[in-house]
């Protein structure tokens, strides 16, 4: 990371190095952005960027119908407002975490910032929990590139006979003419970060105790890091399947290349291509040049007594190649945490019941639950950091809060649910208006009015009976 030396010098600290993970991070960024090392346009090897699809699908399922509710006090209401402001970004944040293995979410006093591993330096961690970190933030103004380094850490200090661990935040700004260097130091007041302090005072709880954790949250993928077991960073969800992703790109490129080269070709003697009605003695070489030919016809100048004609119809091996693609997709999906056959190329599976889905995709369900657990852990830390900010800057009154996470069922089948609820209505277990609200889009008021209008009145029943008598 090009800002490592400047950061270490500015804050007089040694960042925890992991050359192996630095390589993984760089490769992950390239693969996720659609520029894997095996891409070779010259030799026809393209990429379908399935690493992006894996990360996106994992994030989609993990955040399916997510709902975060915070209750308990005025502080809870303020935290709910902060959540609602970034709610639709949560899925993207999870995707970045799946793609890079780690993503860090940090309050900035106004909203939440998100950092990938190539934008941070770890300075301290305890039992795989990161407690010290340097963040890199940038912006461009005119021809200048501005960079801010923000250092978060705990520090042990003596207060009389007691040892306390206050939390500190330090900021340093830089300016450069190129994006590949942070350049020279510049005063914070000369940047858009002018309201920030270079060094914060000690941050402690109101009772003088140390904070319960750092002022940021870290999302890591659930699988163990077998590349560097000592680092708290996670691995991309596709880390175990890089070789298969390479094979998939090669196989797909070969298949599409075969399709591109499969155009029907007709080789025909120029004497066969003369305009209709031309006398035989006038069928001279080059006469076909004045005739508009279909694009698949190639003119062959014959010099023999017989005219030449041949059709070339290449045979496609699509079915065989698709089977190979499906085998690779299944292996990639399994290594990423999904059930066998979750990813299939060009295949219709038809309708299945929720019970079948739960049985077939049990591995997927467990994997997504693990990802959701990591997301909850990260967001809990973020809410704690936000609450500390609220205390420091008086954003809201202090108070207890309780966070509830609700996720959608990935085995949910709407048609089955609809039939089940209609059965409840017919059995008299629930009122009909609830069914119309849940499945037909009615408002509660309109649904109740419609049901009431359709319900025969008791007086009308008696009147009808008397009229018949």
Give residue ranges: language-model regions.
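Extended, helix-rich architectural segments
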Residues: 1-144, 466-469
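Extended hydrophobic-aromatic, low-complexity segments
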Residues: 17, 341-345, 415, 432-435, ...
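Generic structural marker for isolated residues within well-ordered, non-membrane alpha-helices
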Residues: 76, 329, 383, 432-433
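C-terminal amphipathic alpha-helical
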Residues: 86-100, 105, 255-263, 269, ...
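Extended, regular secondary-structure scaffolds
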Residues: 104-235
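Extended, charged amphipathic alpha-helical segments
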Residues: 196-356, 410
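Charged, long alpha-helical assembly modules
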Residues: 312, 316, 324, 331, ...
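Activation/maturation switch segments at domain boundaries
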Residues: 422-469
């Amino acid at each position: 990371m090009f800002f490592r030396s400047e950061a270490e010098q500015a804050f007089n600290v040694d960042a925890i190095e992991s050359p192996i993970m630095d390589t993984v991070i760089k490769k992950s960024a390239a693969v996720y952005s659609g520029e894997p090392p095996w891409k070779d346009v010259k030799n026809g090897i393209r990429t379908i960027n399935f690493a992006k699809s894996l990360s996106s699908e994992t994030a989609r399922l993990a955040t399916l119908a997510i709902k975060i509710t915070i209750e308990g006090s005025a502080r809870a209401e303020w935290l709910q407002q902060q959540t609602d402001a970034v709610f639709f970004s949560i899925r993207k944040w999870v995707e970045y975490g799946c793609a890079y293995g780690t993503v860090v979410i940090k309050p900035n006093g106004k909203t939440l910032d998100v950092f990938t591993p190539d934008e941070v330096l770890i300075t301290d961690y305890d039992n795989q929990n990161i407690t010290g970190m340097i963040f890199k933030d940038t912006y461009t103004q005119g021809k200048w590139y501005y960079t801010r380094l923000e250092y978060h850490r705990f520090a042990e200090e003596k207060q009389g006979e007691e040892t306390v661990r206050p939390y500190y935040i330090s900021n340093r700004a830089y300016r450069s003419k190129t994006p590949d260097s942070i350049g020279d130091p510049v005063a914070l007041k000369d940047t858009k970060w002018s309201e920030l302090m270079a060094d914060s005072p000690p941050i402690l709880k109101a009772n003088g105790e140390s904070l319960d954790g750092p002022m940021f949250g870290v999302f890591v993928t659930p699988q163990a890091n077998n590349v560097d077991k000592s680092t708290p960073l996670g691995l991309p969800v596709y880390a175990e399947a890089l070789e298969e992703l390479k094979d998939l790109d090669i196989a797909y490129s070969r298949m599409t290349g075969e399709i591109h080269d499969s155009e029907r070709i007709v080789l025909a003697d120029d004497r066969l291509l003369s305009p209709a009605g031309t006398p035989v003695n006038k069928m001279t070489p080059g006469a076909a040049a004045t005739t508009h030919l279909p694009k698949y016809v190639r003119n062959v100048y014959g010099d023999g007594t017989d005219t030449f004609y041949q059709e070339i119809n290449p045979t496609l091996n699509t079915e065989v190649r698709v089977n190979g693609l499906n085998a690779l997709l299944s292996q990639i999906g399994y290594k990423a945490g999904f059930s066998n056959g979750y990813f299939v190329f060009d295949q219709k599976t038809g309708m299945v019941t929720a019970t079948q889905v739960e049985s077939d995709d049990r591995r997927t369900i467990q994997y997504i639950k693990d990802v959701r657990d990591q997301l909850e852990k990260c967001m809990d830390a973020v809410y704690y950091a936000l609450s500390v900010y609220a205390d420091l800057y008086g954003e809201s009154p202090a108070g207890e809060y309780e966070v509830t996470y609700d996720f959608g069922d990935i085995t949910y089948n709407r048609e089955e649910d609809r039939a089940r609820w209609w059965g409840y209505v017919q059995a008299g277990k629930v009122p009909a208006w609830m069914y119309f609200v849940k499945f037909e889009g009615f408002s509660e008021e309109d649904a109740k009015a419609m049901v009431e209008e359709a319900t025969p009145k008791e007086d009308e029943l008696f009147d009808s009976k008397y009229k018949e008598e």
